[in-house]
Swiss-Prot record:
GO cellular component, one term: transcription regulator complex
SUPFAM superfamilies xrefs: Fibronectin type III
Polar residues composition bias: residue spans: 347-369, 425-438, 586-599, 620-661
The keyword Cell membrane is annotated on this UniProt entry: no
Swiss-Prot/TrEMBL GO biological process terms: DNA methylation-dependent constitutive heterochromatin formation; regulation of DNA-templated transcription
Listed name of the protein: Activating transcription factor 7-interacting protein 1
Native source organism of the sequence: Danio rerio (Zebrafish)
TM helices/strands, residue ranges: none
Family stated for the protein in its record: Belongs to the MCAF family.
Length: 815
């Protein structure tokens, strides 16, 4: 009888759950014990092969028949014996074996349970098991493979398999197996010869079995990696050879192993569930934190918005308070104006203005009589002579300066002036002429008048009456703009104080309650100026003039006949500083000598732009005499009466006050010129100049502009040149000079004590250049001058000196 060694005839595989009990082994024992009696039925029965779930070869059938023949005498004793001599294997029991095996009656409950278990496995249903091991079964655990062997061999080989493959040390089982081995040794020689074939077969099967174990372990490890797929497939292969007496022990051991594996599986599932739960909790915590953060951010944004609203409301309230104060001040000014109109006697005052014109013989000072049909002006000769010989009555002095003087600026600018009417000492009584409506002297109250003055380049001149009595003194400036080009588009407001000066005042014989102010208008400007009230009317007079270096409009009362208004050719900006100046005019190229009266407050919103091109004229308005004359466009009104007056002196004339002015009238607001100390002489050029220096000329004369920096309490000096000369050598440095004129010394006339001092040198950069000076003494006047030094050591001419005040608006209002 030959056996195919490469094949596995003795290996029977069936599907079973992982928690299968020892009842299956009992079934297998019953099957092996009944093989001798039911050999024919088993060999011819077709359901036998499907029940074992294996492939039965002819060798296997022959081996089963041989086993049945060999073990036939001992069948009855084996059924009752506690330790059968057949190997124990797991296999589902067929239904017909339950009726043929007497030993199955003892294990009916277990057999029934296992039948249910097998039925549920085949139908892929997970019905609960009645056995204790079935209760521990995990529903997720799938069915595995269980390999069983039924070969008939010696107990020694079975012990080796049991110890090597299963690695379970069972002492009691080993003793029983030894007893069975002794019984096997007493068998017939045929049995020994027949057993030789299964022994050789078993060796081959054990080698194959070891390989299968490795494959199953690797496959089981691979299956366990599918934890995330919610599918677990357990494979358990057992090969147990023992007698029937060790069934309980083996059952307990297998159950223990299965429970351990199941516990590991449950712990794995529990760990996975716990990890998922932790992840969910973390996500929930993160979402909660984000919501809290968003809520906190929203709260902060709401607080910020509320604070912004509060700040906005506070700013609005402060602005409203300022507007209210301004309105109250305007109302008080209007009331004071009404009171002054009620108490002022009716008279007509003519204002005399002097214009600095060029040396052209066809243009001179002129008297303009308003051609309006109202009795605003009195052309009577006695009144004119009286006004000409007495002290000045009305003075208008500008406080706001701009950067764009002379005829090169735009003509559409205007300023708003405020006139403060203030009475002064009047030692004489007006008795030289009868007044129709009452000639008694009445004290004049203070009066604030907003008066828009259209000046060239935003620069207001000085209107001074030669007939004494009332003077306009600057009080404050509501807007002071940049010293270069910002004045072209802004309308600063100037405040004047109308103050009555001491001196003999003659009353007018006219009954018209008006003061006629002859207004100086630049060429091409507007011809009408709104009058502040019924008591003061402003008319304009124009004559064709030439661009002259007129720094201010001042009094010129050389003869009694020089009365009446004159038109200024172009009022010049005064020094670029925010000082209120009544400036006297000088020659075309000489430096103007402004004498400041007060300093207005510079607004915070003013902008200083030091990037103006060279086409801007210097601040003082001094230009070359070669400028072509500019003709004036006549206004639509009737032409004024012009009476020419001869100019005394040569082409250079400084405006002087009238000879009848009292000494008390010489105040800082007057237009008397202030003599400046001579500028330092330029040092001699180097004795030896390089050859290339002979082809170049000394540096050009710079043009200086001044501006105030209110926030830093400083003065900005900026300079440039009118037109760049290519023949001049490169400039190395600029030298800055200044001298400090005290206010009291200017009043006392101690100008000889003023000396120029060098305040520093600035490395030359591309023009225009600027620098800022700080740390000044309040209440003083400063004059500045700049000259250039080229790379060969030669000095150029000084610029026209510029002046500025360092004085507070309060002090100017008190002067």
């Amino acid at each position: 009888m030959e056996v195919a060694v490469p094949e596995e005839p003795q290996k029977k595989i069936f599907r079973a759950r992982k928690t299968m009990k020892m009842s299956d082994r009992q079934q297998l024992e019953v099957l092996h014990n009944t093989l001798a009696t039911t050999n024919s039925s088993l060999s011819s029965s077709p359901p036998q092969t499907p029940l074992m779930n294996g492939t039965h070869t002819e060798t296997e059938k022959d081996l089963n028949n041989k086993e049945g023949d060999l073990m036939a005498p001992a069948t009855d004793s084996a059924r009752c014996s506690p330790s059968p001599s057949f190997p124990v294997s797991r296999s589902p029991s067929p239904p017909n074996t339950q009726t043929t095996s007497p030993a199955m009656d003892l294990e009916d409950p277990l057999v029934a349970t296992e039948e249910k278990k097998e039925t549920s496995n085949k139908s892929s249903s997970s019905s609960p098991s009645a056995s204790p091991a079935g209760l521990n079964c995990d529903p997720e655990v799938k069915e595995g493979f269980l390999c069983l062997s039924e070969e008939d061999e010696t107990q020694a080989d079975k012990d080796e398999k049991d110890s090597s493959e299963e690695k379970m040390n069972v002492d009691a089982e080993t003793e029983d197996q030894k007893e069975e081995k002794d019984e096997k040794d007493t068998d017939t020689p045929e049995n020994a010869e027949d057993n030789s074939a299964p022994v050789g077969l078993k060796r081959t099967l054990s080698e194959e079995k070891d390989e299968d174990d490795k494959e199953i372990e690797e496959e089981r490890d691979g299956k366990r990696a599918r934890l995330e797929g919610e599918e677990l497939e357990a494979q358990l292969e057992l090969k147990i050879t023992a007698n029937g007496g060790n069934r309980d022990k083996i059952e307990k051991m297998v159950q223990q192993l299965v429970e351990e594996r199941l516990r590991v599986l449950q712990l794995t599932v529990f760990d996975r569930s716990l990890k998922e739960l932790k992840d969910r909790v973390e996500k929930i915590d993160n979402v909660t934190k984000q919501q809290n953060a968003l809520q906190h951010i929203n709260t902060l944004q709401a607080k910020i918005s509320r604070l912004a609203k509060k700040f906005g409301a506070a700013n609005q309230a402060s602005e409203n308070a300022k507007r209210t104060q301004d309105a109250q001040a305007a109302a008080a000014a209007a009331q004071a104006n009404n009171a002054t109109n009620a108490t002022t006697p009716q008279r007509t005052v003519k204002t005399t203005v002097d214009s600095k014109l060029s040396s052209s013989p066809t243009v001179s000072n002129s008297t303009a009589v308003p051609a309006q049909p109202k009795p605003l002006s009195t052309p009577a000769t006695p009144t004119s002579s009286a006004l000409a010989t007495t002290a000045p009555i009305l003075q208008i002095i500008s406080t706001t300066t701009s950067s764009t003087p002379s005829s090169t600026s735009l003509p559409g600018q205007s300023q708003t002036g405020t006139l403060l009417l203030k009475t002064g000492p009047n030692p004489t009584v007006m008795t030289n002429a009868p007044a129709t409506s009452g000639g008694q002297p009445v004290a004049m109250q203070q009066l604030l008048i907003q008066l828009p003055l259209a000046m060239a380049n935003g620069q207001s001149g000085a209107l001074v009456n030669a007939a004494g009595g009332v003077g306009l003194i600057p009080v404050s400036s509501l807007s002071t703009v940049s010293n270069i080009n910002k004045a072209k588009t802004t309308t600063p407001a100037t405040t004047f104080m109308l103050q009555k000066t001491a001196g003999n005042v003659s009353s007018a014989t006219s009954s018209a309650p008006a003061v006629s102010l002859a207004r100086a208008v630049y060429p091409g400007g507007t011809g009408t100026v709104s009058s502040p009230n019924t008591g003061i009317s402003v008319t304009t007079a124009r004559t064709p003039t030439q661009c002259a270096a007129v720094v201010g409009v001042s009094t010129a009362a050389a003869s009694p006949g020089t009365t009446g208004p004159a038109a200024t050719g172009s009022a010049a900006a005064a020094a670029g500083s925010p000082s209120a100046s009544a400036l006297a005019s000088k020659t075309d190229n000489q430096a103007s000598t402004p004498k400041t009266a007060s300093q207005p407050g510079r607004p915070k919103g003013s902008v200083i732009d030091l990037t103006e091109d060279d086409d801007d004229v210097q601040v003082t308005g001094v230009q070359k005499a070669t400028v072509s004359p500019v003709t004036t466009q006549r206004s639509s009104g009737p032409p004024p009466l012009v009476s020419s007056t001869p100019n005394t002196g040569t082409g250079v004339r400084s405006a002087q006050r009238s000879t009848v002015d009292s000494p008390s009238q010489s105040r800082p607001s007057s237009s008397s010129s202030t003599s400046l100390p001579p500028l330092p002489l330029a040092p001699s050029p180097p004795a030896r100049l390089p050859p290339e220096a002979n082809h170049t000329s000394p540096p050009q004369q710079p043009q200086l502009k001044l501006a105030r920096v209110q926030s830093q309490n400083g003065i900005v000096l900026s300079w440039c040149v009118a037109e760049t000369d290519r023949n001049c050598a490169a400039v190395d440095t600029y030298h800055l000079y200044a001298y400090h004129q005290d206010h009291q010394s200017s009043v006392s006339g101690a100008s000889a004590q003023m000396l120029w001092k060098k305040i520093g040198e600035v490395k030359a950069l591309p023009l225009p250049m600027a620098c800022t000076l700080t740390q000044f003494v309040s209440g003083s006047t400063y004059y500045f001058a700049v000259r250039a030094k080229d790379v060969y050591g030669r000095f150029g001419p000084f610029c026209e000196p510029q002046c500025t005040d360092v004085i507070t608006p309060a002090s100017s209002a008190s002067t």
